[in-house]
Swiss-Prot record:
Changing T282V: Normal interaction with FtsZ proteins and with ARC6. Lost ability to form contractile ring at the chloroplast midpoint. Residues 424-455 are annotated as: Disordered. The gene is FTSZ2-2. This is Cell division protein FtsZ homolog 2-2, chloroplastic. It comes from the Eukaryota. Aggregates to form a contractile ring-like structure; contraction of the ring was accompanied by an increase in the filament turnover rate. Self-interacts and binds to FTSZ1 in heteropolymers to form two morphologically distinct types of filaments, termed type-I (smooth filaments) and -II (rough filaments), in a GTP-dependent manner. Part of a complex made of ARC3, ARC6, FTSZ1 and FTSZ2. Interacts (via C-terminus) with ARC6. Interacts with CDP1/PARC6. Binds to PGK1. It comes from Arabidopsis thaliana.
Length: 473
C-alpha cells in the first residue's frame, strides 16, 4: 500500500483532524503541525486517516470552545492559557488503540469542498448502465435512475430514494411503449421532481440507450433542466445495434439531435462498432451487456479524473474548462501491460471503441495516466509522445497522473477529445464519421519518435509536425 505523508495544521486547543474525501487536508486557519496520512487502495476503497499518536477518547471529543478541564490543561496558569506548550511534551496514554476512522463515517457531503457528480440513467438502457456501474463499485458519484416503467425500477440496486418515476399521470407506471414523444411528455410532466433530483450537482452525466421511448424522449428534457440550472451536463449515449431495426435507428438519431442542443458535451457510442470486438457466437444478451459496460467506462473515465487524487491532479475546474459548451466529444480508454505498456495504452485509448473518429480536429484534450508505484517518468513520456504527436499543436491540453498501487504491472489511459462544435457549425452537419473515416480510425496508429532520455517538456512534443503518421504495426 502506498502512502503519502504531508504536514497538516490543526488548532492547538481543538485536537480535531479535518478530513476531506479526496485527501487529508488541513483547516487553513490553523497552527500546530501534525502528521496526516493519505493512502490509496484502488477505486473500491476510500482514503483513511490513521493517527500515529494515541489519544484518550475524551480528548477527541473535546469541543474547540470548551472551557472545562481537559487532558492538556495544567496546574500552571501559563500552560492553561497556552495549551500548545504542553502538547509538545510526551505524556502517558490510557488507551493503546490507534485511531483509525473510515472517511465515510467522519465525513458528510457538506464538510468538504468537492465536486458533486451525479449519474442519471434514463430509460431501460440508461438504468442498466447505472446498475452495472454500481456493481463495479464506482465511488465518488451519486447514482439515479429515471424511468416510466415502475416494474423495471423496482429491481434496480439504486437506493429507492434515488429512483425517479416520471409521467405518473401519463403512463401510470407502465412505460412509454417505445414512443419518444411519450417519454418527452413524461419528463415534461415531472420537471419539478427532476429539478429536485438535480439540486446541488456540479456535474451531471445523462446516460441512455437511444432508440426507445423513455431514454430517447426523456434524456433531452432532463439534460436541458440540468444545463438551465448551471450544471456541467454531459450526455453519453449509445445508438442501437443494426439488428434492432431501422425505426429505432431513426428515433435514436432524432433523440441525439435533441440531446445535442441540451448538453455541454455529448459522447455517442455506436453499438455496431462493438460487434467487431466480439465473436460471431456472442449471445444477444452479452452484446447488450457489453454496450452497458462501455457506458460505464465512459462515465468512469471522466469521473475518476475528478474524484481520484493524483500525482498531477486534474480537478473539476480543469474538466469544466475543457467540456463546457464543447459540443460533440470523443473519449478513449486504453489499458496495457508489458515492456511497452505506456505506448500501447496510449494507442489503445486512441483506437478505443468510444472514439468514433480521430482526435486530430479536437481543440481540447484532457488525458489521464494511471499506473502503480512502478510507473516511471520514461513511461509517462512515452505515452505523452504518442498523444501529442497526433493532436493539433494549438489544442488546449490538460494532463493528469495518478499512482494507484492496484495498477501494479499495468497502465491505464483515459483521453477526452472535445471542441468539435466549431467544425460542426462551420460544415453545417453534426460530427459523424463516414464509413471510410470509421474504417481508417480503427486501423491507423500514430508514430512515435520517443527515445530514452528525451525531455517530457510538452512544448517539445507540440513542435513535432509533418512526420509520417499512422504506420501499421
Amino acid at each position: 500500500m502506498a502512502a503519502y505523508v504531508s504536514p497538516c495544521l490543526t488548532p492547538p486547543d481543538s485536537r480535531v483532524l479535518t478530513v476531506l474525501r479526496k485527501s487529508v487536508l488541513p483547516d487553513h486557519h490553523l497552527g500546530t503541525r501534525v502528521g496526516c496520512l493519505r493512502m490509496s487502495e484502488g477505486t473500491t476503497k476510500r482514503y483513511r486517516v490513521v493517527a500515529s499518536h494515541k489519544y484518550e477518547s475524551s480528548s477527541i471529543r473535546n469541543s474547540l470552545n470548551s472551557h472545562s478541564t481537559s487532558h492538556f490543561q495544567s496546574q500552571d496558569s501559563f500552560l492553561n492559557l497556552h495549551p500548545e506548550i504542553s502538547m509538545l511534551n510526551p505524556r502517558k496514554e490510557t488507551s493503546s488503540v490507534p485511531i483509525t476512522e473510515d472517511l465515510d463515517e467522519l465525513s458528510t457531503p457538506n464538510t468538504y469542498n468537492e465536486a458533486r457528480i451525479k449519474v442519471i440513467g434514463v430509460g431501460g438502457g440508461g438504468s442498466n448502465a447505472v446498475n452495472r456501474m454500481i456493481e463495479s463499485e464506482m465511488i465518488g458519484v451519486e447514482f439515479w435512475i429515471v424511468n416510466t416503467d415502475i416494474q423495471a425500477m423496482r429491481i434496480s440496486p439504486v437506493f429507492p430514494d434515488n429512483r425517479l418515476q416520471i409521467g405518473k399521470e401519463l403512463t401510470r407506471g407502465l412505460g412509454a411503449g417505445g414512443n419518444p414523444e411519450i417519454g418527452m411528455n413524461a419528463a415534461t410532466e415531472s420537471k419539478e421532481a427532476i429539478q429536485e433530483a438535480l439540486y446541488g450537482s456540479d456535474m451531471v452525466f445523462v446516460t441512455a440507450g437511444m432508440g426507445g421511448g423513455t431514454g430517447t424522449g426523456g434524456a433531452p428534457i432532463i439534460a436541458g433542466v440540468a444545463k438551465a440550472m448551471g450544471i456541467l451536463t454531459v450526455g453519453i449515449v449509445t445508438t442501437p445495434f443494426s439488428f434492432e431495426g431501422r425505426r429505432r435507428a431513426l428515433q435514436a438519431q432524432e433523440g441525439i439531435a435533441a440531446l445535442r442542443d441540451n448538453v455541454d458535451t455529448l459522447i455517442v457510442i455506436p453499438n455496431d462498432k462493438l460487434l467487431a470486438a466480439v465473436s460471431q457466437s456472442t449471445p444477444v444478451t452479452e452484446a447488450f451487456n457489453l454496450a452497458d459496460d462501455i457506458l460505464r467506462q465512459g462515465v468512469r473515465g471522466i469521473s475518476d479524473i475528478i474524484t481520484i487524487p493524483g500525482l498531477v491532479n486534474v480537478d473539476f475546474a480543469d474538466v469544466r474548462a475543457i467540456m463546457a459548451n464543447a459540443g460533440s466529444s470523443l473519449m478513449g480508454i486504453g489499458t496495457a501491460t508489458g515492456k511497452t505498456r505506456a505506448r500501447d495504452a496510449a494507442l489503445n485509448a486512441i483506437q478505443s471503441p468510444l472514439l468514433d473518429i480521430g482526435i486530430e480536429r479536437a481543440t481540447g484534450i484532457v488525458w489521464n495516466i494511471t499506473g502503480g508505484s512502478d510507473l516511471t517518468l520514461f513511461e509517462v513520456n512515452a505515452a505523452a509522445e504518442v498523444i501529442y504527436d497526433l493532436v493539433d499543436p494549438t489544442a488546449n491540453l490538460i494532463f493528469g497522473a495518478v499512482v494507484d498501487p492496484s495498477y501494479s504491472g499495468q497502465i491505464s489511459i483515459t483521453l477526452i477529445a472535445t471542441g468539435f462544435k466549431r467544425q460542426e457549425e462551420g460544415e453545417g452537419r453534426p460530427l459523424q464519421a463516414t464509413q471510410a473515416d470509421a474504417s481508417m480510425g480503427a486501423t491507423r496508429r500514430p508514430s512515435s519518435s520517443f527515445t530514452e532520455g528525451s525531455s517530457i517538456e510538452i512544448p517539445e512534443f507540440l513542435k513535432k509536425k509533418g512526420r509520417s503518421r499512422y504506420p501499421r504495426l
